[in-house]
Regions:
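N-terminal helix-turn-helix DNA-binding module of bacterial transcription factors
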Residues: 1-74, 343
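Bacterial carbohydrate/catabolite-sensing allosteric modules
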Residues: 1-11, 56, 97-102, 150-157, ...
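Conserved functional loop/turn residues at catalytic and ligand-binding sites
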Residues: 20, 26, 36, 58, ...
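Short beta-strand segments enriched in small/hydrophobic residues
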Residues: 24, 29-34, 68-84, 184, ...
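Amphipathic helical "hinge" segments at domain boundaries
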Residues: 59-124, 128-132, 210-213, 217
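Short hydrophobic/charged patches on amphipathic alpha-helices used for structural packing
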Residues: 65, 119-122, 145, 182, ...
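Short beta->alpha connector loops
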Residues: 112-115, 136-141, 260-261
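Acidic, Gly/Pro-rich loop/turn segments at junctions of secondary structure
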Residues: 132-145, 157-166
Length: 346
């Protein structure tokens, strides 16, 4: 192994200070401080010399003292479920854009759908003195946050409500979107419709199941217990659930997939079947319009959810004190082909 760094004269750990800038520019420390902090009282020529010294030395302001003086860090934390999930990319970008518009830095992390990991991340962000938090909760008990909220950390929940505390929340219309999906399948002649969803402890999974059952009941259709499967979105589990529904003596003729991970596995399973089976998925996903048939989905608006949540957060940071807000963002059914397949003849 060759050590390519051997013999280099570069030194680490010697960041330039305001004292170095002052010496290079030939001014006092107070003058450098005024320039760095954008304060008045410095002539244009002096400001130019200080800025040239800052550029030459690569000086960066240390915000620690300023934070201690002002009590605000100009940073917010975002705790997501899974950074790799396509639903969270637009949400993350929207929160970041609003934060940038307010001069704030966004720090994010993933809970991996683990309540203990969520709490660990949230408290770590609080320890770093973020001004506020946007949380997609993995757990259902957020009383651990009460001391932080009391201490002034603004908090908004997204996609799922907080558990056992009152807080601002931004949700999709999960119930209404699920109703629309199932009603769409019923309108195309389906009577035996299976639902495969996420773990029942998750708010969105419960709401989508409720929408499924409500739509079936509204059409006067029974729901066989064998047509409903909630649990992990692991592909093996989803495949087993779909296969059981499709191979039953009275097989389902359509599937309603509770999120995009379930939908992707369902597409693979249905592609192996000899007869076409209708499919509607909750959540749009990349390439959904390119497979054949293209996938009919209930599309959420994660970017709007992120903007709304960040707007509520900065509203709190601006000092607005009123009861917690609950904002519900509508969904949209996009018919592309898979949800319009009629039931196969028995």
């Amino acid at each position: 192994v060759t050590d390519t760094a051997r013999g280099t004269s570069r030194r680490y750990g010697t960041r330039p200070t305001m004292k170095d800038v002052a010496a290079r520019a030939g001014v006092g420390l107070k003058t450098v401080s005024r320039v760095v902090n954008g304060e008045p009282g410095v002539t244009p020529d002096t400001e130019r010399r200080v800025q040239e010294a800052i550029t030459a030395l690569g000086f960066r302001r240390n915000d620690s003292a300023r934070i201690l003086r002002k009590g605000r860090t100009a940073s917010i934390g975002l705790v997501l479920e899974d950074l790799a999930d396509p639903f969270y990319g637009p949400l993350n970008r929207a929160v970041e854009e609003v934060a940038r518009d307010h001069g704030a830095l966004l720090i994010n992390g993933s809970s991996a759908e683990d309540p203990a990991r969520e709490q660990e991340l949230v408290l770590a962000l609080c320890a770093r003195r973020v001004d506020g938090l946007v949380i997609i909760p993995a757990g259902d008990d957020h009383r651990y946050l009460e001391p932080e909220i009391t201490a002034g950390i603004a908090t908004v929940f997204v996609d799922r409500p907080a558990g056992r505390i009152d807080a601002d929340v931004v949700l999709s219309d999960n119930f209404g979107g699920a109703q629309d999906a199932v009603a769409h399948l019923i309108a195309h002649g389906h009577r035996r419709i299976g639902f495969i969803g996420d773990q029942p402890r998750i708010h969105t999974a419960r709401e989508r199941l409720r929408g499924y059952r409500t739509a079936m009941a509204a059409a006067g259709l029974p729901v066989d217990d064998a047509w409903v499967s909630l649990g992990s979105t692991d592909p093996d589990r989803v495949r087993a659930a779909a296969t059981a529904m499709l191979d039953a003596p009275q097989p389902v003729t359509a599937l309603f997939a509770g999120n995009n991970r379930v939908t992707v596995t369902a597409v693979r399973v249905l592609g192996e079947r000899p007869r076409p089976v209708a499919l509607v998925g909750f959540d749009d996903f990349e390439l959904a319009d390119l497979v054949r048939p293209a996938i009919t989905v209930v599309a959420q608006d994660p970017a709007r959810m992120g903007r709304t949540a960040a707007g509520l957060l900065f509203r709190r940071l601006d000092g607005i004190v009123d009861p917690p807000h609950r904002r519900e963002i509508p969904t949209r059914l996009i018919a592309r082909g898979s949800g319009e397949i009629p039931p196969a003849e028995d």
